[in-house]
Amino acid sequence: MPNIEIAQADEVIITTLEELGPVEPTTEQIMRFDAAMSEDTQGLGHSLLKEVSDIQKTFKTAKSDLHTKLAVSVDNPNDLMLMQWSLIRITIQEELIAKTAGRMSQNVETLSKGG
């Protein structure tokens, strides 16, 4: 039977936090932390409201474009299809916004009841 030799490990195994000693953050970590702390501190609610506001602006723009197209008499089938597509897109966006708002209100109610 051959001899199997196990080499002794030369590295030190750290078993407690005290043995680790103080850890200094790198310059990159400090810069990332400072950047994160200096960002807008309005919170998640403010971010959500801003996103909904941005969606509302694009929604209003799409609606006004559609109204402009509908005001002009169009005989070209391609233009009619583009108008129909715009109307479908607006309808889908409207439904998604309504569903999102409903889900958000349900989540807020759940948080306020369970908190």
UniProtKB/Swiss-Prot annotation:
Entry keywords, A to Z: Plasmid, Virulence
Keyword Protein biosynthesis listed: no
UniProt-listed GO biological process terms: protein secretion by the type III secretion system
Induction info: At 37 degrees Celsius in the absence of calcium.
Entry superkingdom: Bacteria
Pfam families reported in the protein's UniProt record: T3SS_basalb_I (PF17001)
Function: Belongs to an operon involved in the translocation of Yop proteins across the bacterial membranes or in the specific control of this function.
Family: Belongs to the YscI/HrpB family.
Name of this chain's protein: Yop proteins translocation protein I
Gene symbol of the encoding locus: yscI
